[in-house]
Amino acid sequence: MSYDRAITVFSPDGHLFQVEYAQEAVKKGSTAVGVRGKDIVVLGVEKKSVAKLQDERTVRKICALDDNVCMAFAGLTADARIVINRARVECQSHRLTVEDPVTVEYITRYIASLKQRYTQSNGRRPFGISALIVGFDFDGTPRLYQTDPSGTYHAWKANAIGRGAKSVREFLEKNYTDEAIETDDLTIKLVIKALLEVVQSGGKNIELAVMRRDQPLKILNPEEIEKYVAEIEKEKEENEKKKQKKAS
């Protein structure tokens, strides 16, 4: 029997192949990074180069779900659009029903449950996306969650998904400290440094969004990103000079 044809059939060694193939689709997607700071959450995404005549504003990997929650994704953009639309409707429905915005965990659990349902019924296939969901709860606590195509979700301090996730995650494990997220600017720089591990052409291929407590999502413009990249390059040069002085 071909176990990779039926979505609801386990292989003898316990695999659901269609779910694993969806996870492979995520690994081919653009790299996305999320970092939870003290009073800020930051999402960064590797931007693919667009066609010369294409409007790049229509190619977005970061979007707001509600005033206090936003998400970045890696994987199939068309699948992400369905998940985003469903999540936005759920956020609005929650506001109308209980007159409060959703918590970040609530909407993460909703998205994870939606994905999980698509792994358990015939005539459907799993969503080929992983998502980083960030925001603030109404007590002002910053949150970062990650979901995958199987419908599992976890809370993180910092995480990465997509093509370069492994090397970016290794970078974050080494460099994420309380000092590294002491200020908003340092948190933003940490995300940019993490993305520069896999993005070759500097700031012009990075999309960055920040959300601060009681403030809406802000997408940074290319000039702001280039300013941070220039500061990072300058810091690198100064550190190299210090190392050379010590060596001599």
Curated annotation (Swiss-Prot):
Species name: Bos taurus
Name of the protein this chain belongs to: Proteasome subunit alpha type-7
Cellular location(s): Cytoplasm; Nucleus
Modified residues (N6-acetyllysine): K227
Gene3D superfamilies in alphabetical order: Glutamine Phosphoribosylpyrophosphate, subunit 1, domain 1
Disulfide bonds: none
UniProt KW keywords: Acetylation, Cytoplasm, Glycoprotein, Nucleus, Phosphoprotein, Proteasome
SMART domains registered for this protein in UniProt: Proteasome_A_N
GO annotations of cellular component type: cytosol; nucleus; proteasome core complex; proteasome core complex, alpha-subunit complex
Similarity-based family: Belongs to the peptidase T1A family.
Keyword presence, rRNA-binding: no
Organism superkingdom: Eukaryota
PROSITE patterns: PROTEASOME_ALPHA_1, PROTEASOME_ALPHA_2
